């Protein structure tokens, strides 16, 4: 077959295949046009998942009759000058949306410019334009798209159900509404009640209002404001506390110069910032806005304009990580307290069992007098915590007056040999002793690694740990990384490892259990995992093994010492796996449980 020039209608339909993938693509392009036109309000309607009908109406600047005639021609745009391709300041810029939509659907445009005496309307059906005629419209532009893909019926079979396509439209509008809280949006159709997001006030409060309206009250209650700026690049937005997570990354909303994007660089930076707070199977919820000179970012790298390329990607990543880490560290104590709200809703009034209860047969520690199986308060604690602080040797009744004003209060008791209950001026706090100490040890290991290295203790008799040859090879291959944390191992034949030194911070540790856990984690590591992340995984595993275990009875001075160390430790609100280390119940919360409020 000889080479020949394709007809214009076929060319437009091929081009439309890149721009118009599904109904949500149409909505995205048309709403972006409305935003670029200076609209203060955008109304979106869809029916049949967008296949049967899509209507976008705005109160923007509109178009003149002459502009309307050009608007449906390919590569005709008012948003780009000859030299502006590397300095794009609008959401749209290629001039492909309207002609692409008109090539595969029945398109109707009605618009009115302030300089025109009345509105004008134009129709395009399968690429064929109708003459422009007068119309009635008070302001802005109204675009109707009907029978999407009627001109390319083969595309219809690749669409999902109406419900799925409608949800994709909803997600597109949500993202654009988050990007522009100063614009009012209405989403209607699909046999659902209309949703309206009113225009918000400028600045962070208005942005949080819009994000809360879209992402829900949970996000608003757990939102932490973050921000960082350097060398002309600014990162701002809101990140949810580690107590609010999702099973996937769909709750991460990223915007560059007001454009919603899905950028692997930014997603990786978010994951890195939360690495010390979340388990690997949970994902944070964030809304981040990156602002920089338009010449420092290329938005023309994807047909749907959902990806960007940064000139200085390293700077952008560093700013995002810094902003998130700083915000999470600043609000660390508050994030743990938020976990109590959900627990309160699960409380139910208790009922006594039938019959008479003999309190004398109850196996509890006496309040005063008598004997007890608990350790004597006068004994010195074991070396699990640093008890050299001023509160270490203070009896509970003596410590209360001054310790009640401390953030984590004064220890009152231990329940189930696992949880510490402390009293504050305004309520009580329940601490998971293992999770809390695990975070303390983890932060100490990191600090030692950043300073002069982790101090080691030499074993007089090396521990010989037997395991399969593959596991031995895996551990020996990472011996240099393990030694950075004071764990010195070497091969001891084909099926064993000799442990010669262990970290001093861990005290007496079960080397066999620690090595097996480390080997299991190493088996899951991707070879591309950065060294820093591998080291943090090692530190987290060591911290878990070096922490006080659930089931150990603690003395009052040990409990108070742990509380004081938590107050002095960054990120102490969560353990290394992302779970809260403590929950706080205010006096008001307690009164609610008993119907006093």
From Swiss-Prot:
Keywords: DNA damage, DNA repair. GO terms for molecular function: ATP binding; ATP hydrolysis activity; ATP-dependent DNA damage sensor activity; mismatched DNA binding. Pfam families: DNA_mis_repair (PF01119), HATPase_c_3 (PF13589), MutL_C (PF08676). SUPFAM superfamilies: ATPase domain of HSP90 chaperone/DNA topoisomerase II/histidine kinase (SSF55874), DNA mismatch repair protein MutL (SSF118116), Ribosomal protein S5 domain 2-like (SSF54211). GO terms for cellular component: mismatch repair complex. GO terms for biological process: mismatch repair. Gene3D superfamilies: 3.30.230.10, Histidine kinase-like ATPase, C-terminal domain (3.30.565.10), MutL, C-terminal domain, dimerisation subdomain (3.30.1540.20), MutL, C-terminal domain, regulatory subdomain (3.30.1370.100). Signal peptide: none annotated. This protein is involved in the repair of mismatches in DNA. It is required for dam-dependent methyl-directed DNA mismatch repair. May act as a 'molecular matchmaker', a protein that promotes the formation of a stable complex between two or more DNA-binding proteins in an ATP-dependent manner without itself being part of a final effector complex. Belongs to the DNA mismatch repair MutL/HexB family. This is DNA mismatch repair protein MutL. The lineage of its organism: Bacteria, Pseudomonadati, Pseudomonadota, Alphaproteobacteria, Hyphomicrobiales.
